[in-house]
């Protein structure tokens, strides 16, 4: 994969901001960013396509719970690093589970913003 130039990094940043601020569903925002990123950095889009094809071919996600399904019991660290059990969180009410890879992941940031407005 080739490296991203500073000018292209800026173009991706602006594309993210446009997608984040656009009126539309989360899927429309994600699709718009994916298309913009392919225009700016085709090698990245091709690498993502290969990864998705490999995951789909290997059944990636087939056994994952779907929206509305009960989650299996688990523990994860909270914001201070202390392990918290799902069962203890459920005592306070419903729980939403999201996987956020980091501030550097535009797709994750769009997903968080769809669930937590203003994030």
Residue map of PLM features:
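Short, intrinsically disordered, charge-balanced linker/junction segments flanking boundaries
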Residues: 115-119
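Short active-site neighborhood of thiol/selenol oxidoreductases, capturing the structured segment around
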Residues: 86-113
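Non-globular targeting/processing and membrane-anchoring segments
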Residues: 1-92
